[in-house]
């Protein structure tokens, strides 16, 4: 039988760490974290009631007071005091991250430390967590690359084991790799279905409805609420008629419809799902002006187009259930052989759109990787309507933030 005294001691250890974090007492935190012998991972302990980790506690303690106790609005001295609190909070956050705190750990309210900072209006602390997320994701992406190189030299069975270990980076819905690994009970219930992988999607039966395209697991492949985004993307890419354009991923055909309105000279469409291809043919896409349909995955089709010397003035990328690594390969290895020097390209920017901090992190990650590949990117902020009622009958709400950032990429000068 477990000694209840031991349980109390463990709880006291946890509460002592959380208290030191909320008091921004770095010397005490250092002593508690580095000398603790009873907790396996003291920098990431959790409060059983709130789910707060030390990062949450350090940030929540910076919540500003709007009024004095007597109800009088203040600014001067309290403003200085608040600044001092936030500076101490920032130093504590920095220390905890250096000690191995998980930047995107979830509390019982389904909030990461960055979510708490954003909700409380703590901009500098929020940006600090965004930067921590960027560093973590860049490192993970690089490590994924190293694992791929190692897999090439291993036996097939070992390679399969490695693949099993990295399946979590596959995209769910329209978003990029899931950035929040910890889950609440609600999230776990939502994610009990099969993993969303590109191979499973391509083998699945699809449901075509007026306002959505669903796979057999009720994942939203494309939805009508994206229409305004697609219209603006097409006009950004094709400001004049007579241009040559490539779209990777037809889906419901929303963006291709707007591309047609711009009267392109050539309109190439790559579509990998056989049921979508059949629907395209049923709707007569193959007979539309300038349209060429390429059936298959872009990984198989684009090298042939490059070999044929086919070039485009505009490219759009919107695939389903591919990883960020696939996307990076697309713009790092393929676009350069297909896009004219003065051409532009864009993509559906759904990376990390399940929460604002994830979206902000992946915007910065993408910017850095695009720069490494030789591209400049501009972003246009587009306000979105409330989408709460859009997800009825859909397994996972792949968009949970208030606005969309439309990317427009071109070669660096």
UniProtKB/Swiss-Prot annotation:
The keyword Heme does not apply. GO terms for molecular function: protein arginine N5-methyltransferase activity. Belongs to the class I-like SAM-binding methyltransferase superfamily. RMT2 methyltransferase family. It comes from the Eukaryota. Transmembrane segments: none annotated. Residues 192-413 form the RMT2 domain. GO terms for biological process: methylation. Its main location: cytoplasm. S-adenosyl-L-methionine-dependent protein-arginine N-methyltransferase that methylates the delta-nitrogen atom of arginine residues to form N5-methylarginine (type IV) in target proteins. Monomethylates ribosomal protein L12. Residues 65-85, 148-178 are annotated as: Disordered. Monomer. It is found in: Cytoplasm; Nucleus. The keyword Methyltransferase applies. SUPFAM superfamilies: Ankyrin repeat, S-adenosyl-L-methionine-dependent methyltransferases. Residues 148-173 have a biased composition (Acidic residues). Gene3D superfamilies: Ankyrin repeat-containing domain (1.25.40.20), Vaccinia Virus protein VP39 (3.40.50.150). This is Protein arginine N-methyltransferase 2.
């Amino acid at each position: 039988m477990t000694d209840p005294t031991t349980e109390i001691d463990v709880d006291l250890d946890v509460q002592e760490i959380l208290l030191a974090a909320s008091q921004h007492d770095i010397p005490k935190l250092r002593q508690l974290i580095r000398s603790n012998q009873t907790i396996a991972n003291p920098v990431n302990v959790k409060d059983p009631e709130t789910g707060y980790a030390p990062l949450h506690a350090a940030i929540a303690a910076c919540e500003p007071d709007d009024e004095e106790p007597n109800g009088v609005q203040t600014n001067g001295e309290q403003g200085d005091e608040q600044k001092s609190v936030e500076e101490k909070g920032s130093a504590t956050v920095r220390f905890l991250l250096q000690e191995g705190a998980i930047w995107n750990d979830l509390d019982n309210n389904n909030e990461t430390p960055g979510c708490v900072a954003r909700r409380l209006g703590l901009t500098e602390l929020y940006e600090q967590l965004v930067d921590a997320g960027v560093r973590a994701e860049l490192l993970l992406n690089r490590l994924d690359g190293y694992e791929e190189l190692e897999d090439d030299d291993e036996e097939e069975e070992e390679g399969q084991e490695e693949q099993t270990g990295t399946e979590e980076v596959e995209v769910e819905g329209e978003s990029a790799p899931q950035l929040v690994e910890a889950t609440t009970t609600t999230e776990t219930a939502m994610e009990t279905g099969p993993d969303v992988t590109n191979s499973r999607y391509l083998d699945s039966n699809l449901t075509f409805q007026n306002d959505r395209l669903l796979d057999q697991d009720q994942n939203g492949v494309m939805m009508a609420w994206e229409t305004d985004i697609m219209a603006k993307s097409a006009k950004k890419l094709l400001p004049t008629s007579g241009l040559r354009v490539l779209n990777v991923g037809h889906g419901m055909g929303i963006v291709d419809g707007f591309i047609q309105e711009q009267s392109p000279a050539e309109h190439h469409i790559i579509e990998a799902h056989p049921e979508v291809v059949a629907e395209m043919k049923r709707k007569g896409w193959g007979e539309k002006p300038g349209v060429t349909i390429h059936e298959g995955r872009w990984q198989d089709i684009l090298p042939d187009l490059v070999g044929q010397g086919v070039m485009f003035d505009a490219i759009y990328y919107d695939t389903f259930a591919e990883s960020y690594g696939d996307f990076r390969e697309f713009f790092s290895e393929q676009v350069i052989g297909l896009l004219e020097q003065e051409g532009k390209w864009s993509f559906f920017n759904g990376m990390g759109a399940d929460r604002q901090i994830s979206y902000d992190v992946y915007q910065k990650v993408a910017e850095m990787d695009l720069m490494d590949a030789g591209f400049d990117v501009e972003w246009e902020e587009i306000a979105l309507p409330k989408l709460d009622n859009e997800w009825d009958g859909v397994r996972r709400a792949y968009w949970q933030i208030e606005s969309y950032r439309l990317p427009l990429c071109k070669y660096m000068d």
